[in-house]
Amino acid sequence: MTRPMTQALTPADRALTWAQQAALVVGASMFVAVCARVTLPLPFTPVPLTMQNFGVLLVGLMLGRRRGFAALALYLAEGLTGMPVFSPTGPGGLAQLLGPTGGYLIAYPYVAALAGWIMERGPRTFFRAARAAVLAEILLFASGISWLVVFTHSFAQALRFGFYWFIFAEIIKVMLAAGITTGWRGVRKV
């Protein structure tokens, strides 16, 4: 016998109505779409530097695994239908999901879910949020680099195109997402 959906939710989730839950998911997918617009194309790699990863991390850390996954699955569905939610440097739609950055995009729901799952498992401290974001980034880059290997036929080339140039920026995104998450949770307690 399966449990009702309301029993599977955390106490904080049950406090929100279904309309509020849906609004959070839709709002989070829109937030990631806005983050995708903040893009810096790099001439030496097909992977642009964007704030998308930051948005994905923040959504996962703030909304938890279920809503984080739902928000990023919705984001991908929006992109597949042709809505301009992906980075403007790519072709958009299915072509963007099948292009060089597809491995990163496809991982987004799982990245948000992993970050959210870790945050749900203990005290909501900066260290936990940063650790959750780092582990989620490892999943993100493992997926993105694996996908790039298909295009470059070289693991070393995939690392050059999709990892090395982004390390410093990703550290900043992790710290920013962790800081906002724990700061916001502190403000909400007051």
Predicted features by range, described:
Residues 39-114:
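Alpha-helical membrane segments and adjacent membrane-interface helices in multi-pass membrane proteins
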Residues 31, 35, 39, 59, ...:
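Alpha-helical membrane-inserting segments
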Residues 45, 122-190:
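Membrane-embedded alpha-helical hairpins and interfacial helices in multi-pass inner-membrane proteins
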Residues 1-69:
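Hydrophobic transmembrane alpha-helices
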Residues 89, 118, 159:
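Short, flexible helix/strand-to-coil boundary loops that buttress conserved ligand/catalytic motifs
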